[in-house]
């Protein structure tokens, strides 16, 4: 389990659907990390194992996780698979997951709880749509997302 209190800041980079093996090699040759900061790289899932490093403050994170632990869910990654691959962080509730895959707060909450049960830190993404922003609903939307998405369990229990 990672002790987050040892870091002064946490930086998370979501590579989305970008990158390749050559990019990863070049990126890590140029990457310098501050020992007081935690840096998390979330590449496309096929590259997760290429990011395993010996840096004590550099971690790989998944861009999403399934609500299911196993079964006929083509293309999904379970929390157990993330554990097997020594993944310590996972994004949940990203705006693109909400927009393109109709992901709801309840799903984000379920994923977050599953991750915590497996000692993976959920990185809960919140944010309003452009339409919600234009209607001045930002505060209400963000408040509801925080209330609905924050897991019932604690990583620190």
Model-derived regions: residue spans:
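Active-site loop-to-helix "anion-binding N-cap" substructures in soluble metabolic enzymes
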Residues: 1-157
């Amino acid at each position: 389990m990672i002790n987050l209190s040892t870091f002064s800041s946490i930086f998370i980079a979501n590579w989305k659907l970008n990158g390749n093996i050559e990019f990863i090699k070049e990126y890590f040759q140029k990457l310098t990390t501050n020992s007081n900061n935690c840096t998390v790289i979330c590449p496309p899932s096929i590259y997760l194992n290429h990011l395993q490093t010996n840096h004590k403050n550099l971690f790989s994170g998944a861009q999403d996780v399934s609500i299911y632990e196993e079964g006929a869910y083509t293309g999904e990654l379970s929390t157990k698979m993330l554990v097997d691959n020594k993944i310590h962080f996972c994004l949940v509730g990203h705006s693109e997951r909400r927009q393109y895959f109709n992901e709801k707060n309840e799903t984000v909450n379920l994923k977050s709880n599953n991750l915590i049960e497996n000692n993976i830190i959920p990185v809960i993404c919140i944010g309003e749509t452009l339409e919600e922003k234009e209607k001045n609903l930002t505060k209400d939307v963000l408040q509801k997302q925080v209330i609905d998405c924050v897991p019932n369990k604690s990583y620190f229990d």
